[in-house]
Design a protein with these regions (language model features):
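N-terminal beta-strand motif that seeds the catalytic metal site of vicinal oxygen chelate
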Residues: 1-27, 33, 75, 116-119
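Short glycine-enriched loop/turn motifs at secondary-structure junctions
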Residues: 9-12, 67-72, 97
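Residue-level marker for the onset of beta-strands and adjacent loop->beta junctions
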Residues: 14, 48-49, 73, 99-101
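Short beta-strand-to-loop elements that line the ligand-binding cleft
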Residues: 18, 39-42, 93-95
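Non-catalytic surface loops within mature trypsin-like serine protease
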Residues: 20-22, 56, 66, 79-81, ...
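Vicinal oxygen chelate
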Residues: 21-24, 74-112
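Conserved acetyl-CoA-binding loop of GNAT-fold acetyltransferases
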Residues: 31-38, 91
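Conserved short beta-strand elements that form part of the metal-binding/catalytic scaffold
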Residues: 37-73, 113-117
């Protein structure tokens, strides 16, 4: 038996939520690769939630609430020119045995931001 889904919606984007001690921790790393804070919300209790958006439309959320995830996390970005982006971030991309070229950035809370492209 084959199940056929008739979707009336489109998943536009998957947005990771990165747990951080302070929003500035995520901002420091993400700004190196072209992201900027597009909005933030402070629900009280000295907690903050923010969205960082890249000019190409990709978003990453950061949350000071440890209830949003276990953390630290790894966020993987597939990019079209990893060497150019690595140079912008002050990093060096390297070929991996699994057929990609990648570099990593790590924030002060231990979250890893990994950027790569297929070889």
């Amino acid at each position: 038996m084959q199940i056929v889904f008739r979707l009336t919606f489109v998943i536009e984007q998957v947005v990771p939520v990165v747990p951080v001690s302070k929003i500035s921790v995520a901002e420091e790393i993400l700004s190196k690769v072209g992201f900027s804070m597009s909005w933030h919300h402070n629900p009280g209790q000295n907690l903050m939630y923010a969205e960082f958006t890249h000019p190409d439309g990709i978003s990453v959320h950061a949350s000071e609430s440890r209830g949003d995830g276990i953390g630290p996390v790894v966020v993987y970005f597939r990019v079209s020119n990893v060497d150019e982006l690595a140079a912008l971030a002050g990093a060096t991309a390297e070929d991996q045995t699994w057929g990609t070229r990648e570099f990593w950035l790590r924030d002060a809370d231990g979250n890893a931001y990994r950027f790569g492209q297929y070889l």
